[in-house]
Amino acid sequence: MPYFSRLILFLFCLVVLVESRKPKKRRWTGQLETSKPSHLYKKNPDMTKIRHGKPQPLLRVDDHDFTMRPAFGGPAIPVGVDVQVESLDSISEVDMDFTMTLYLRHYWKDERLAFPSASNKSMTFDGRLVKKIWVPDVFFVHSKRSFIHDTTTDNIMLRVFPDGQVLYSMRITVTAMCNMDFSHFPLDSQTCSLELESYAYTDEDLMLYWKNGDESLKTDEKISLSQFLIQKFHTTSRLAFYSSTGWYNRLYINFTLRRHIFFFLLQTYFPATLMVMLSWVSFWIDRRAVPARVSLGITTVLTMSTIITGVNASMPRVSYIKAVDIYLWVSFVFVFLSVLEYAAVNYLTTVQERKERKLQEKFPCMCGMLHSRTMMLDGSYSESEANSLAGYPRSHILPEEERQDKIVVHLALSNESSSSRKKGLLKGQVGLRIFQNTHAIDKYSRLIFPASYIFFNLIYWSVFA
């Protein structure tokens, strides 16, 4: 037993000796200690590497229920809106829509976001805070597509003032429907509207209004379109009613566009006018040149058909007549009538030649007098040639006032043996002179067609321009 007590005492002394030889640990003080204290080696602490405690948040977002609107159960919360239009990107006649890029800003007051501030300065946040607080649920009525820009981050800004006033701004591109009237196209003006409205809150919960009236809408002076002249931007507001939900405040961004006519003058009106004028060349071509006049008429008709097809391909299929349709189809009718004019001339020429052959077969002794008479009336032969063929020498050409009577008397004396043949001859060559003289139809067409087309243009441009 004494031996065991001695052993325990020995072990205890050994443990005390070992513990006394270990170095003592020092607490970290954040100060750099050196063996040689000097101001050359003294360093200030790096505050970026010092761990701070969690600061007390100024906006107590977690202390409130932001699923409810501000002042829930009370009067409607007023939400002011202003818009700055950055660009009007495109206008589509086929789809009847427009694309616009704009800055949309909302203003309202939420006392739950009020915070103490000695300097009365606001705090600015990005889009991450938007998901934690209440914001107005404004959407674009009749919108087809829209998105918030996200380069390089979501283009959303939230600014909160100490008294709870909130500014909520975002950059949006929206494509919306525009009801267009093309009855005066391309001499038309179009008025389009971008409409804003709360999706869930009626006018009893949310009062949407333009913050500064007409001054709430600002536009960039550099906005321009290739086919349109932007005439006016203005704002309006009214109530919209839905039978299942009630009345809603709706804001309108209205703008008026007037189409540039110069592009369509070059692409549509000028080519159509040239085709009509080209069809008139047929009236100066000899009526016996069938291939030339027929090919010219067919070419102008097909070209007009191509112009009409090209214009309609770039337009919506509306159920009413457009101004450009009137011009193109009237021009097409003029071109087509020039083809019909030659068809009539060619037919009458064929009928006339057939009658001449029959008369020559009945009266072979006329020695070419009837033929010479017809040729002179047609204008295909000169005066001296006609009189020479009729038996008159060149030295006996009569004055103008006696020439017609002389020739008629000559023909009448040649056929006085038969009263029936005399009546038929006078009826065929004097009574129907204009209708048998197919050259006269071309002569009258040279005046009637241009005069009618010019008259049509005067009426058209005075009505639609």
UniProtKB/Swiss-Prot annotation:
Disulfide bonds: 178-192
Binding, 4-aminobutanoate: 105, 169, 197
Location(s), subcellular: Postsynaptic cell membrane; Cell membrane
Regions crossing the membrane: 261-281, 294-314, 326-346, 445-465
InterPro entries: GABAA/Glycine_rcpt (IPR006028), GABAAa_rho2_rcpt (IPR008059), GABAAa_rho_rcpt (IPR008057), Neur_chan_lig-bd (IPR006202), Neur_chan_lig-bd_sf (IPR036734), Neur_channel (IPR006201), Neuro-gated_channel_TM_sf (IPR036719), Neuro_actylchol_rec (IPR038050)
Glycan-linked positions: 120, 254
Extracellular topological domain: 21-260, 315-325
Signal sequence segment: 1-20
Physiological role: Rho subunit of the pentameric ligand-gated chloride channels responsible for mediating the effects of gamma-aminobutyric acid (GABA), the major inhibitory neurotransmitter in the brain. Rho-containing GABA-gated chloride channels are a subclass of GABA(A) receptors (GABAARs) entirely composed of rho subunits, where GABA molecules bind at the rho intersubunit interfaces. When activated by GABA, rho-GABAARs selectively allow the flow of chloride anions across the cell membrane down their electrochemical gradient.
Similarity section: Belongs to the ligand-gated ion channel (TC 1.A.9) family. Gamma-aminobutyric acid receptor (TC 1.A.9.5) subfamily. GABRR2 sub-subfamily.
Name recorded for this polypeptide: Gamma-aminobutyric acid receptor subunit rho-2
Originating species: Bos taurus
Primary gene name: GABRR2
